[in-house]
UniProtKB/Swiss-Prot annotation:
Glycosyltransferase involved in the xylosylation of xylan, the major hemicellulose (non-cellulosic component) of primary and secondary walls of angiosperms. Possesses beta-1,2-xylosyltransferase activity, transferring xylose from UDP-xylose to the xylan backbone. Pfam families: Glyco_transf_61. This is Beta-1,2-xylosyltransferease XAX1. It is found in: Golgi apparatus membrane. One of its GO terms (molecular function) is UDP-xylosyltransferase activity. The lineage of its organism: Eukaryota, Viridiplantae, Streptophyta, Embryophyta, Tracheophyta. GO terms for biological process: plant-type cell wall organization. GO terms for cellular component: Golgi membrane. Pathway: Glycan metabolism.
């Protein structure tokens, strides 16, 4: 009997000639007898399975990971293939963690996983996020086809730092960590690497005993046989000055019982430093105290307790606006306080760089602060309005403002009035002033200027208050002063995005010609005086006054005007 499933009419609907007819039923039966229905059904089933398998494979390859539809088992498997969290990268992002049992919150709590160094080094990318170069968006970093070279390098650098810390006596027992930079050398500026220690864990500060206790069961950290380390926390490594700095002891104790009891608990880090040395000089107030304090604590955003030794009430009063910007808490007098202050972290000493300069450095400046950042900090702390100089021609009759800083001691500009008159004649609105103890008031005056002019000396430090792109004119005294002029004020001005102009005084423009013959070393070989040290230099070259030749100096004023319009 012929199967009806495969039978067809012998003619097309509507009839037709013989050429339009289908194959006769007999021929169709001949074909169907060669293909059995059961075998055809098995073949179709196998084909469907193959197509389904291919679809599933391709879907797995191009699927986008979704924490909403991922099961707990899949999420656990994903975390096994991803690098664990570390203190540097923070906890695992929420999409890589499973919700805790009984947690009705819609968010997923982060989970800290034990650190596996082999995985961290092999997979330096952020866990759970695709590489920027990945060709498969949405896949976790552990499954990406390409690795991020920059993060691999960062992981390698972090590993090197950890190994270096182990070699240099960094203690890490439980929550305790002690890291000191005591033997750093800057060949050009040896004073630019003072001793600094960072302390983490149970840190107890006893000002009365001039001691910082650290609960350190391991005893590691480079301490002497008594478990002590002594520092003079002044931010200038100057052998002449350091004997006058209060010495503070860091004492490692094995347990809480061996440390004095806390009289006050603090939830923020402490920073202990000295304002001894040259800190009654504005240049040194900045280079040896305020800039190092900014470099050490700015990242804490006010959440730090300042303790000052060699305490000077007038100094604290003078810089109160800056200290309050760096710390939300009243300064503690380390010389008189009788309590025991307990902190989770502490700094003894301050990090610093060269004078009026902040450069990138892996330990001293890991956050890559610059002098531009410090200038911005000053403007915020002192509420200085201007961050750019005047635009010439913007308003009819507007004249650029020049501030000439006068000096009462040495290195006076003897013909200051003539210089001011020449500048006025060229179109400047000139103000002459001497820096005083009222820092906010004088900072506002400097900030209002477009051009600052001064003879080499501490007064030029006030360039830190100028708006960016203002002009600094330094009159450099006679006596091979180019190195000091460039490194103390010229390069810092450029780093602060100021426009710098300098004028070198000749033999006929210095008052030294009245005190020494032209055959004296002052004129014949001033470099030899520098080689004899600061005391000799201070007694000779630094005592001069200057009287500039207006014919020579006028082009400098024109250059300042031109630089202001660039």
């Amino acid at each position: 009997m012929t199967s009806t499933a495969y039978s067809r009419p012998s003619k097309l609907p509507g009839g037709g000639n013989g050429s339009d007819r289908r194959l006769p039923p007999r021929l169709m039966r001949g074909l169907t007898t060669k293909i059995e229905p059961k075998k055809l059904g098995v073949g179709l089933l196998a084909g469907c399975c193959l197509a389904l398998l291919t679809y599933v494979s391709l879907a797995k390859l191009f699927a986008i990971y979704s924490p909403v539809f991922a099961s707990t088992a899949n999420t656990s498997a994903l975390m096994q293939n991803s690098p664990p969290s570390s203190p540097e990268t923070g906890p695992i992002p929420p999409q890589e963690t499973a919700a805790g049992a009984g947690n009705n919150d819609s968010t997923v709590d982060p989970v800290d996983l034990p650190e596996d160094k082999s995985l961290v080094e092999a997979q330096p990318q952020e866990p759970g996020f695709p590489s920027a170069e990945s060709q498969e968006p949405g896949l976790p970093a552990a499954l990406s086809r390409k690795e991020d070279d920059a993060e691999r390098a960062a992981a390698a650098a972090a590993s090197e730092i950890k190994q270096s810390e182990k070699k240099n006596g960094v203690a890490a027992g439980g929550d305790t960590k002690i890291k000191c930079d005591e033997n750093g050398v800057d060949e050009g500026f040896p004073y630019a690497r003072p001793s600094v220690c960072e302390l983490y864990g149970d840190v107890r500060v006893s000002p009365k005993q001039k001691t910082i206790y650290v609960v350190n069961p391991s005893g590691a950290g480079g301490f002497d046989e008594n478990g002590e380390k002594r520092l003079r926390p002044y931010a200038r490594k100057d052998d002449f000055l350091l004997p006058g700095v209060v010495e503070v002891t860091i004492k490692s104790v094995p347990s809480e019982a061996a440390a004095p009891k806390c009289t006050k608990q603090h939830a923020v880090p402490a920073v202990v430093f000295s304002v001894a040395g040259y800190t009654d000089n504005f240049f040194h107030d900045m280079t040896d105290a305020m800039i190092p304090l900014f470099l050490t604590t700015a990242h804490l955003k006010g959440e730090v307790q300042i303790l000052i030794t060699n305490y000077k009430p007038w100094w604290v009063q003078k810089y109160t606006p800056l200290l309050r910007k760096l710390s939300n808490y009243d300064v503690i007098n380390f010389d008189e306080d009788a309590g025991v202050h307990c902190f989770p972290q502490g700094y003894l000493g301050l990090y610093r760089d060269r004078d009026l300069i902040i450069s990138p450095h892996p330990t001293r400046n890991p956050r890559n602060y610059t002098m531009v950042d410090y200038n911005r900090f000053l403007r915020d702390a002192l509420e200085l309005r201007r961050d750019r100089p005047s635009v010439l021609g913007e308003e009819p009759g507007m004249r650029p403002r020049m501030l000439i800083i006068s000096r009462a001691g040495t290195r006076k500009l003897l013909n200051l009035e003539e210089v001011a008159a020449a500048a006025t004649e060229l179109g400047f609105n000139v103000t002459v002033a001497e820096a005083g103890a009222d820092v906010p008031a004088f900072a506002a005056l400097v900030n209002s200027a477009d051009v600052l002019l001064a003879v080499h000396g501490a007064g030029l430090t006030n360039q830190i208050f100028l708006p960016a792109e203002a002009v600094v004119v330094q009159i450099v005294p006679w006596g091979n002063m180019d190195w000091m002029a460039t490194n103390f004020y010229g390069q810092p001005a450029r780093d602060m995005q100021l426009r710098y102009v300098e004028y070198y005084v000749g033999e006929e423009e210095t008052s030294l010609k009245h005190n020494y013959s032209r055959d004296h070393m002052v004129f014949k070989d001033p470099k030899a005086l520098h080689a004899q040290g600061w005391q000799t230099l201070a007694a000779t070259i630094m005592k001069q006054d200057v009287e500039v030749n207006l014919t020579r100096f006028r082009p400098i004023l024109l250059q300042a005007l031109d630089r202001l319009q660039q």
